[in-house]
């Protein structure tokens, strides 16, 4: 029997009679890397499954990461560009991605929706700690543990989680249960947090924070188009500060008080450079230092062009547009 040779897009499976159209490493968008499927609810799922077939998936994220590490050790650099695809369900893994065992430039993709999402809720510690470059995290509902972050990004020895992208995720503090949404430790550069939702973090449990600066402060962090609500602290620092970063297009909402009033909307701390751009955001509450808005201490940030509800401040025009950094 002759089968037609049909040209199709890369995301279609291989076809009978088309040499080379099927591969043993899963559906991929580039020639290197591997695609591994995780589905804790699938009847065929096990921790020892092949994982490259969605009908023979791995049951845990931990098992998928072990497969990726083994593949990387076997093929060296060809593991770059790998993807972990996670089906809807609740996962309790705690993953630490290091620079030695894991390849750079890989993706973790949650394939859920508003009704059935991918919930990542570790029993303890960080859900995901990254010390490797270029990873993409997309579509995950993080519920951090009481002693960890949803995602922790590190840079402690001259290299680390630079170029990380976190997008389309929900960081859910569960009314004060989770410790941090996204935690920076050290100075990972060029990290992007975009189109995410942060909510329900309590006092000393900020949505985004820097906890330590053993090398330097984060550089060129982009925090774009996120929503922050029902939390006491949104973007703040426990050490250091942000440098040459852009915070744009975000929506900061004053908490209703179920946990407590919002005390910190943005505190950019004390970086080594400053030069942050805080533009095009919506600011609720009191636009002042006492109200929870604090520029980086070098005095060279740009906070012009935000929408603020507090038109009584001298730093806010009568039209609600900020014209200067927040003051005391």
Feature annotation, model-predicted:
Residues 2-63, 307-311, 327-328:
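Right-handed parallel beta-helix/beta-solenoid
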Residues 18, 38, 86, 93, ...:
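Extracellular beta-strand solenoids
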Residues 36-41, 59-92, 106-112:
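Glycine-rich repeat segments that build the extracellular carbohydrate-interaction surface of secreted
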Residues 62-77, 91-101, 126-130, 152-156, ...:
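Short, T/G/N/S-enriched strand-turn elements that build extracellular solenoid repeat scaffolds
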Residues 79, 100-104, 123, 132-133, ...:
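Parallel beta-helix/beta-solenoid
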Residues 94, 103-152, 173-175, 201-202:
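Right-handed parallel beta-helix/beta-spiral solenoid domain characteristic of secreted/periplasmic
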Residues 170-231, 235-238, 242, 247, ...:
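Solenoidal tandem-repeat scaffolds enriched in leucines and small polar residues
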């Amino acid at each position: 029997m002759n089968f037609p040779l049909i040209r199709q897009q890369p995301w279609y499976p291989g076809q009978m009679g088309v040499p080379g159209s099927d591969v043993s490493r899963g559906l991929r968008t580039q020639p290197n890397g591997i695609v591994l499927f995780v589905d804790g609810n699938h009847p065929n799922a096990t921790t020892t499954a092949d994982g490259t077939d969605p009908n023979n998936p791995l049951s845990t994220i931990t098992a998928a990461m072990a497969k990726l590490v083994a593949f990387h050790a076997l093929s060296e650099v060809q593991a770059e560009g790998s993807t972990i695809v996670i089906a809807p369900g609740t996962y309790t893994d705690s993953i630490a991605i290091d620079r030695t065992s894991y390849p750079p430039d890989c993706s973790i993709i949650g394939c859920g929706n508003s009704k059935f999402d991918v919930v990542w809720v570790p029993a303890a510690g960080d859900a995901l700690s990254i010390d490797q470059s270029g990873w993409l995290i997309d579509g995950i509902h993080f519920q951090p543990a009481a002693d960890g972050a949803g995602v922790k990004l590190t840079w402690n020895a001259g290299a680390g989680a630079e170029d990380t992208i976190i997008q389309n995720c929900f960081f859910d503090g569960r009314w004060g249960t989770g410790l941090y949404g996204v935690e920076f430790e050290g100075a990972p550069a060029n990290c992007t947090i975009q189109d995410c939702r942060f909510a329900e973090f309590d006092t000393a449990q900020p949505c985004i924070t820097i906890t330590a600066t053993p090398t330097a402060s984060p550089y060129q962090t982009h925090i774009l188009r996120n929503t922050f609500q029902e939390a006491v602290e949104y973007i703040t620092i426990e050490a250091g500060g942000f440098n040459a970063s852009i915070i744009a297009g975000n929506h900061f909402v004053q908490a209703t008080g179920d946990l407590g009033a919002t005390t910190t909307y943005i505190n950019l701390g004390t970086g080594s450079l400053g030069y942050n751009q805080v533009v095009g955001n919506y600011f609720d509450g009191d636009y002042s230092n006492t109200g929870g808005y604090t520029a980086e201490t070098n005095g060279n940030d740009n906070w012009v062009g935000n929408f603020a509800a507090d038109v009584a401040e001298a730093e806010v025009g009568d039209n609600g547009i900020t014209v200067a950094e927040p003051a005391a």
